Each structure stands twice: as structure tokens, then as C-alpha cells.
């Protein structure tokens, strides 16, 4: 008995694993009869090319697979262009009702999984994930690798700081950046062990030289040979990470297309978003905003909007939706930077929400606004124009007057308002 309406008469469900791919070709006749053909292929290049030939011979026009780790990528790369492909979230496949009442629920096997994917695809019940073109996927690899290396560098710097604390070197309490130019000179002097604390402190540069007495006291620790070995090892690791990040920066600039570089300049104008962050954003969302009908769709895809929690006509606070964690992390950092930029709309928005809902919610709200601004700029190709720090006060002048009068009255003042004539 046919349960679902047929949208794709000839399609294929792919159950992808590390070493094998199980394919189920599903054909639905005009009279509703269903014919299924199953085959298993290795995930070697020859095996996947054979899978493509097998599907083309059977005139399959569309196939679907779950986003299983990184194992789906070789399958997608070799089948892309030969037929329409759909990558779906495993959660969406499991949450579709109906499998529990069919014979597919009796035993869970790779064959049953491929048949279920094919059945959902044939019925049009699968929601495709956004898979960008190959150049953008390669740019993503570069930006995500750079982000991972920067995280590794931060962790290594924290380990280095722990070694300094173990040696009772309080350099971080005096110098704002232990890994700055002055800080590294002092670290190398500590590693060599050929200078007194006063001589090491004398390596300070710029404004840090005003703190030489404090530096001398902070550098008077007990540095053993073990500490020197660990400091040398960790400082070398930090410098290696910096060299690798520099190579990635250069490579990212090389592979970006002229269109992406134009978009990069537009995003770089947004407060809180620097060039590196703009590269990360473009690598995740691309320049073609037709994939996202509205800015709200993009915000939801990025995981920067609350989930739905509504009952009896009342909306309650909900947890953030799952989304693109790389894009969310980048925009969270950008939102925090924007909140500290004076005389900007985002800073005013952050202050306004933080006073009522807290800093974390305010930062997330600014990140939501930033991703919506990114969509508007990329969609319309227009330059960024800041609304200004007075936007919310001008938006509701009466409320602003009431709030200010109330604050003065609480201090014991009697307030009389008189509007000035325009000059």
C-alpha cells in the first residue's frame, strides 16, 4: 500500500559509511507500483565512479544522503554534476513520522536506512541542507582551519602562562600582552637564563618602560631548567601556529574571487567585523543570497534566533536554535567587539538590551542584527550606513522622556518639560 504521495518517480537513497555506500533506487509506476533495486559500493574512487555509472544507467535524476561526518564529501564530490544531489540532516530523517508503522521499522540495517531515505525523497519529505559550490567549500576549509589554529594558539598561550605562574613569574600582571614584542623578548631572556630580573625588565619597549620597577619585581621568580624547557617548547609552538596562520591568510587572499573581494569590502564596513571576520562570514554564507529568502532565514540558519516556544497566544523565551557553529562563533566575537565601539547603533542596542536581559542575550541580539545587515548588504549591493547611537531614543521620543523624567523625580527633582523652538 502506498502511504505517501510521489514527487520523484525515480530517485535514489544513499546510506553512506566510511568504507561502503548502500544505494537504493526507487521507481514508482503510474499505477502506484513500487520497484526497488539495491546495491553496495566501496567508497574508493573507483567504487564511487562505479556508483555514478550505475545510477546514470538507471536514469536516476535525484539522490539523497545524510550528512554523516565527513564521509559524505567524497560521494558528493564525485557524483556532483552527474545527477541532482540532496544532503539532509540526520535529525530530520529520523523525525519524519511513519517509519514506525512500516516494515522498515522491524530491523535497522544499512539497506533499511537507504530504503527509508529513498521513500522520503520520493515523497518530497526531505529538506535539503545548504551545500555551497566547490570554490566556496575550499574557502571554508581554509577559514575553518585558520580558526582552529587560532584556538590552538590560544590554548598553548594559556599553557605557557601556567608555566610562568608555576615559576612565580607575574609578567601577566604587569604587561597586558605576554606574547607582545616586549613580552617575547623577556620570555626568551628567561629561557636563556643569562639575565638578572632588572636586565630582563630593561628589555621593555614603548609605554611598558614606565613599569620597569614593577616588571623587575614580577620577573623575580624561581625559573628552573624544567621551566625553561617548557617555555621554549610552548613559545616555539605559538610561533609555529602564527606562521601557519600567516600562510592561510595569504592563501585565502589568493583564492578569493573579485566578487568575493568586493563583498569583503562591504562587510568590512560593519562595526565589529574586521577583514578576517568578513572572510569567515563570506566562506560560510557566500555572496549569493538567493538561498536565503529573507534575512530572518539566514539568521535562523546561523543559529542566531530563538526557537519557537508559544502557547495560548503567548511567546516565551526559547533556547537558541542549532545552526552553523562556525558562523555563530565568528559573529559572537564580532558582536562583542561592536558593543565596545562607541557612537554606533550596535553599541546602543547592546546597552539597551543588556540593562534588561543581561550581557549574553544582548550580545546574541547584536550578532543577530549583524547577520541581518550582512544579508541586506550582499542582497542589495549597498554600502553600510550606521543608524547612530541616538536611534532608539528618536524611535520612541515619548518613552525616552518618561524614562528620563522618572529618573530625575526619583532623585527628588520636579521636572517641567518645555520644547525648544527649532533654530
Model regions and ranges:
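A detector of single, family-specific signature residues
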Residues: 1-423
